Amino acid sequence: MQLIHKGYKGSAGYDEYDKLYVGNVLGIPEIVYYEGKNLIELSKNFKEAVEKYIESKKTH
């Protein structure tokens, strides 16, 4: 599964140990991580992570 929001791509995987879906925004120098209890929550948290990343770039 690949996530895309506003041109940013994100990974998606499942962490058996923590029983969570996890991912990070791809193609950027910073590590932007997100997680969710299910794929719907993962997608929502990915979009929020991208929005926060975009906002942080405006202030720097």
Model-derived regions, located:
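Short, charged, surface-exposed hinge/linker loops at domain edges
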Residues: M1-G13, D18, V32-Y33, I40, ...
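Positively charged, aromatic-enriched nucleic acid-contacting surfaces
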Residues: L20-P29
